[in-house]
């Protein structure tokens, strides 16, 4: 943390002061004293200028030197990429100021030196010593879940519609969440209460207005305070961050909850993932149990661990299963979404009315190609762009099948499904059954300079091209390009057919709209 102070203040005094302002895990171990904070033309802290300031780590703890070649290599790379000196093996790399982009560059440099270290390893181990000590440690996949959790899977066909007037929506500022909000306003008569926390000094209402303006414009904005209401709260807090009276009033008012809030990055601080994805979901379930409210939970097909499993699993993953022996602990996002779903399935078995929607690859709108605001963070898109940029693929990668599920179609299907009583007590796979291959994308984009190479040649090409962050991140985070887990969504497809809902075909025009802007 950079700070400006007119007098000498001890680090422990700064930490003590910050304890009253932020959670303990957000208090940094390192403070960098400056004469002044550089300001950019917008009057904000100039992060670019801050990153160029070379400084020596000041510490309370004793400096510990590297013990082996790996630690020496990592120390050298960290100091180079972060423009600092005097990094010891017990210094917290994240608290020194490393963000996800810095960690991507560090892992790319390590890959060039024949060391494969995942970004998540930095978030979990934090220091050079701990990263070294766990470098070749296998993830313990032994699990108490010997068999899949049991729940009474409701086999009824859609017939009876439910009535709901007031919906509580979490995650309304997210890409899927904002489209669910639009779908509720457009195609139901319900009022929607959006639980949103303040962030970076911007209150929840303003945050929602910004997102609505970006994705939908004035028509939906007019519904604020008419059918769309913002409640300041936080799913990770007790009573959802509300006082007891507010919590009670909300509980008696709401007929239906759609829980879309989640941390969806594939790496990050374990504590935050667990707080939002696991504890937050428990808090929402507790709210629904207390007031006998139907719960619709947005999960992910990634709980199958299909993209991190490097071994063939014979058992099929479908809507009736959760744990089939897949290595879900390999990825922090998958692990926490798995645990959230596991907890909800247990609640379902006890009588809570829950519908779980496992989403596939959510892509741009089918109607007009509009994509998520923070598209540069989309792992699926980055992967495709990386293949195109490097100009090389393997045969296995060319034939790998995946879904492209437009966000407007996903949100429409979710709302249509949850309107039926028979949908509760079920799990659905909301993923386009009209699959596409990388070969199909390359053909649609009319790209002719892609070479087919061996796995070894492909990996060597990546190691010499550190700009291909999307693929480097996949390699260092154990992402697999192959089908080691058989995912079956027949139950969902049959259910959709009964509702006369059909997935769109992904044509060349849609693919070009999705990718072309980024290639240019």
Task: Please report, for each region that a protein language model flagged, where it lies by residue.
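AMP-binding/adenylate-forming catalytic domain of the ANL superfamily
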Residues: 22-45, 86, 102-105, 113-135
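N-terminal Rossmann/SDR dinucleotide-binding element
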Residues: 139-260
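Conserved Rossmann-fold NAD(P)-dependent oxidoreductase catalytic core, especially the SDR/UDP-sugar
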Residues: 251-252, 256-260, 267-275, 279-332, ...
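AMP-dependent adenylate-forming
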Residues: 1-67, 71, 75
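Mid/C-terminal beta-alpha module of Rossmann-like enzyme folds, strongest
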Residues: 416-476
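Thiotemplate assembly-line natural product biosynthesis machinery
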Residues: 12, 16, 61-87, 102-112, ...
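Phosphopantetheine-attachment site and its flanking helix in carrier
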Residues: 91-113, 126, 130, 171-179
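Phosphopantetheine carrier-protein modules
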Residues: 33, 75-99, 103, 112-121, ...
